Amino acid sequence: MFRGVTSISIDNKGRIAIPTRYRAELREQHEGVLVCTVDIRQPCLLLYPLHEWETVEQKLLALSNFDPMQRRIQRVMQGFATECEMDAAGRILLSPTLRQHAQLEQQIMLVGQLNKFEIWQDKQWQSQIAEDLALGGSAEMLNCEALKNLSL
């Protein structure tokens, strides 16, 4: 399970270092292989351990190729999906295309989301989290059926 927010630098080759606390698990359970793709709703990237990505792929495969919206989702998520193998130093390479999509520069935020990470450009993350926190007490959130029984 991935949790927390970590500020990470991108080196001049486009590599990021996975935080040390996750490396052993990723190597042991996923052979150090991750898959990075774009988020279809946000200007960020999604980084999955390979086995988690394979579950997502099955869901994408189940979508209809004949429905234009479903086909678009397949095209974007699968089309951008790139395998990233951790090197001996725990780094992965983010392709220029992926970095461009999320407008990644020198400093990024790696955000644990249980079964995956989100990768955000640091200023975009600050803006998004401020918006998310402001929504906390809104009528929209209070009326959301899926959240009515959520107890934290």
UniProtKB/Swiss-Prot annotation:
> Domain SpoVT-AbrB spans what residues?
5-52, 81-124
Which residues fall in a coiled-coil region?
none
In the record, what terms sit under GO molecular function?
DNA-binding transcription factor activity; transcription cis-regulatory region binding
Q: Mind telling me which CDD domains this protein's record contains?
A: MraZ_C, MraZ_N
Please tell me whether the keyword Disulfide bond is annotated for this protein.
Answer: no
- Its recorded name reads Transcriptional regulator MraZ
Q: Name one GO cellular component term.
A: cytoplasm
The annotated subunit structure for this chain is: Forms oligomers.
Q: Which GO terms describe its biological process?
A: negative regulation of DNA-templated transcription initiation
Q: Source taxonomy lineage?
A: Bacteria, Pseudomonadati, Pseudomonadota, Gammaproteobacteria, Pasteurellales
Give yes or no: UniProt keyword Transcription. Answer: yes
Domain of life of the source: Bacteria
Where is the protein localized? Cytoplasm, Nucleoid
